[in-house]
Amino acid sequence: YGDGALTAIRWEADSADRSRFPEAPATLVMMNGFDGYAEEIIGFAEHFSSRPFDIITFDGPGQGNTVLAGMPLEPEWEHPTEAVMDYFGIESAAALGVSFGGYLVMRAAAYCPRISHVIAFDMMYRLLDGLTLPLPRALRPIADAIVGNPRPAWLIDAAMRIAPRFNADLSWKLQQASHL
């Protein structure tokens, strides 16, 4: 993909379930969020009571192994999704996104007509929510205002140096984002 490669895992359907549910999509493409690995999300599939579809998970740009390879996150999520579907020869699939993957899956579905069904699980409407939702409710509008008007830059830089000292989750997210 581009100058690199995407990691993908394919788990084939249970043939007995496929014959019992012939109307089910043949494939479910599962997508992680901001910091996931393809190997992590496959664990969700263990909880399906039946599995009449193949499951494909992948690390898109800016996720999992692609981060380690220096591939940055890209907003046009339909492109890596279509590349994975092309690689596996998938004509039509349902798609599920978890966390920020819920946002990404909707983007992919909006521009990839081969996605027939969408499940946005535990999603965020914008990446900034991952930083502001853990804040006390009274501070969220202030954070939104600062990010919405990133001037002066020194103020943003100072806030990003100080805030992580008081919030381990924010500290980790900013550290993770520095790789993207």
Regions flagged by a language model, labelled:
Residues 48-65:
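Conserved alpha/beta-hydrolase
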